[in-house]
Amino acid sequence: MMNFLRRRLSDSSFIANLPNGYMTDLQRPEPQQPPPAPGPGTATASAATSAASPGPERRPPPAQAPAPQPAPQPAPTPSVGSSFFSSLSQAVKQTAASAGLVDAPAPSAASRKAKVLLVVDEPHTDWAKCFRGKKILGDYDIKVEQAEFSELNLVAHADGTYAVDMQVLRNGTKVVRSFRPDFVLIRQHAFGMAENEDFRHLVIGMQYAGLPSINSLESIYNFCDKPWVFAQMVAIFKTLGGEKFPLIEQTYYPNHREMLTLPTFPVVVKIGHAHSGMGKVKVENHYDFQDIASVVALTQTYATAEPFIDAKYDIRVQKIGNNYKAYMRTSISGNWKTNTGSAMLEQIAMSDRYKLWVDACSEMFGGLDICAVKAVHGKDGKDYIFEVMDCSMPLIGEHQVEDRQLITDLVISKMNQLLSRTPALSPQRPLTTQQPQSGTLKEPDSSKTPPQRPAPQGGPGQPQGMQPPGKVLPPRRLPSGPSLPPSSSSSSSSSSSSSAPQRPGGPTSTQVNASSSSNSLAEPQAPQAAPPQKPQPHPQLNKSQSLTNAFSFSESSFFRSSANEDEAKAETIRSLRKSFASLFSD
């Protein structure tokens, strides 16, 4: 880590990354520091301080020394030294955080208090009004971003990072912005052959980014082909039987070549994947069926054929969360498509039979939070299920406002579950190795350890300066500069060499002589073994100590799973102090 900071601080481009006012503080003349107010207990200390000789960079010119002020200024200007090291500390913090060497600061409370919800829907429904005033876990607001599939784009990376770009037209103004949604509500079809719109690649991108959604992205992708969904209904039909789940008969043609003849007519031919009654043709006889086969050949897609049911009315059973509704739609215009022309819609009672239909279909593709089952009630008195819709189903009837509120509550419930299951940002790794506390240390067998497997600490992927406590740290070559007093260094070496146990050497690349090893391991305990003899430490060491105290190196970013964290932490602080003292010494 220290090598990285040295290269970073010595780079010519480092000046450009310094905070504003950094160079101005260096060029500003040093203001005079007002002395503290004299008191009865400070007369002796003031005399001793004036008698002591300050450092060369702190000594003011004799001619410019003003008379002592009787009282300090209310707001004294900070000195050059404090401004210098304050700016430097901030710059090094930003540099180390960008390199991932220290824990990034937690986001502010204002930025954490909102979760972004992406709603994919047409603009005629304003979902922002539905979520206005709603909160998640009582703390987080919901920021709604609404757009159609055609107005969205995204990029997703394998490490989980992603960004969604939105280009919408609001009141004649084009709005372009990028954001990171936390949840997605999809209320629009992702694929439709009638309008030549295929947005399955966006669904794949959302799944790639791991975005949670309603319904699930897997189910939305599976609903992009109606025959695929009908195959799931066939499985339900085989499980429940025709009495409980009356599924209509259907024939699937992957292409036009097999569309030769059908045993009975009339039939309804559905070409490809379309919505709102598009691509559906009623065929009365064999000749019309051959004509439709030629049309299917031009579309180069699949087709299905099912018997035409002379319907008395249509049935739609919808489920939103735990809410159930059933509707009956009767054609007034006489068209065989009840969604064409005039029709009468009314809500009917929810029976156990209808509830069984929608509950069985809501379990397909891992579960559907929003779905609806469509069926026809023939004039023969029988029901025929022919389609299942997912979360893109249109809301109908007189209770559309209530249905939108049900969807809103369902989204909030899912977001609450997701937020409560979110793990900690930096969980502690399990303890995989333990450092022996006493006794003879066993020599590690390098032949049993795979060379490519990184160790829990101090592996090849970690920055320099984070070696495990079990390895002997090599001495660092520092340029000539201020250092600790010789008496303190010698006393620290002698005391620690007699008390600290002898540690085995690591690999060949980390072995050093015994004296260097003892000095390297003993210097972290130097302030406890023998305090310095000088009454005032070197000013440069004070600066480096202030720099060291300015950093917040947490245990989660360094020395994970270490049984001797204090010693390793002291070694790192010592290295930081020495390196900064040598870098910024006069």
Swiss-Prot record:
UniProt keyword terms in alphabetical order: Phosphoprotein, Synapse
Stretch list, region C: 114-421
An example Gene Ontology molecular-function term: ATP binding
Localization of this protein: Synapse
Compositionally biased intervals (Polar residues): 421-440
PROSITE patterns tied to this protein: SYNAPSIN_1, SYNAPSIN_2
Highest taxon of the lineage: Eukaryota
Domain note: The A region binds phospholipids with a preference for negatively charged species.
Name of this chain's protein: Synapsin-2
Annotated source species: Rattus norvegicus (Rat)
Record lineage: Eukaryota, Metazoa, Chordata, Craniata, Vertebrata
